[in-house]
A protein has these predicted regions:
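Intrinsically disordered, low-complexity, mixed-charge
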Residues: 1-91
Length: 91
């Protein structure tokens, strides 16, 4: 089991990034949450099998069509309580 907290910055708001990451996570069986943070960041907590979390992390660098990811900071975290990734309100 692996859990990562991600801070993804760049053009990641207003381009469907949160909905895209929810779909990616569900495809790989990864739980947790995702939300907008500030004006140019998305924050996510991913929890699941090591390979599944790594696959979603690798995909995050690509993002949806109009996203332009400038950086991803990933840190180890406590596991998420949510077995299915869900979208939280922005902070």
């Amino acid at each position: 089991m692996k859990s990562l907290r991600l801070i993804i910055s760049g053009r990641v708001q207003g381009v469907g990034y949160r909905d895209w990451i929810v779909a990616e996570a569900r495809e790989h069986g990864v739980g947790g949450w995702v939300r907008n943070r500030g004006t140019d960041e998305v924050e996510a907590l991913l929890s699941g099998d090591d390979e599944a979390v790594d696959a979603v992390l690798a995909a995050c660098d690509r993002g949806p069509l109009y996203a332009r990811v400038a950086s991803i900071v990933a840190t180890a975290s406590e596991p998420a309580d949510e077995p299915i990734l869900r979208r939280l309100p922005s902070v």
